[in-house]
């Protein structure tokens, strides 16, 4: 029997799951349980414990009994590992306690992840549970990139630094880009653009990140679906003092009512493009601001790296929106960046080159697979403890 890993991504109102074989990369099953704790859902899912049972029931209804899956571990995506949790970590009670201490750094993401881990450990007590952290890949950012220019004593006391996020995706995609090009990862200088509802950019030299757009939290950097990205901190003070908004109100606005949705009232880029075509000025502005910020980061990372071999687009928007890719890189031929219009328009779902032959900088589209990366991280940290079926 092939060994497999159950990968869980627990949010406040949803649990995404996937069962994968880390050795072969085969996806055995996947799905999502949504509207946890919400009234009026098609199937009442009162809490995360009920959601876990729905996961098991869904697997069984698809013909995948737990006993027949060859499960050897459960992998959990955790957004923030702070400074000390930066490797795939076998979860024990001490790990849970430390994650709870870190929750103020990721108040929207870590608490539901912790809850998911606790529920899964009770449901599957005989399997090792492994936490894999979004921040891990960026743990060793150069000090100049990781440090905020604020009072050093305050920063040190409260562990304030640029942690970076989407690290599992950035690492996986950079490795896949090297494999696609059949070039050693250590020899490549790369820019990776992870463009989904959450969005981030990274500059990677020889397989190690030297810059990334997200910071202490996933709010910094690029314009995102509902998050503002970079914003003058003075805006927060102004709204607090002048508009009478509380810190909680401002945080909710910057996280949930900003970005493309805040400007254009929409996070689905397919709808956004339709509205732009019909002359919607708000949709056009939202798109223009989104593209402008992306181009700003691409330019900054060209300067940071000095020379670039590969630019790679990934995640939902990056993989599927040819117009975004075109507009981010248009007019940059002086820097060696060109797109082949036909290749860029290709709807293929596999890794592919979208720059013309001979272009100084290769541009790729590489599908991300964070679930497989987490499954393989579990296999890596557990090693011989897993055995083979």
Curated annotation (Swiss-Prot):
Catalyzes the formation of acetyl phosphate from acetate and ATP. Can also catalyze the reverse reaction. Belongs to the acetokinase family. Homodimer. Its main location: cytoplasm. Its EC number is 2.7.2.1. It comes from the Bacteria. This is Acetate kinase. Its cofactor is Mg(2+); Mn(2+). The record marks 166, 227 as: Transition state stabilizer. It comes from Mycolicibacterium vanbaalenii (strain DSM 7251 / JCM 13017 / BCRC 16820 / KCTC 9966 / NRRL B-24157 / PYR-1). It catalyses: acetate + ATP = acetyl phosphate + ADP.
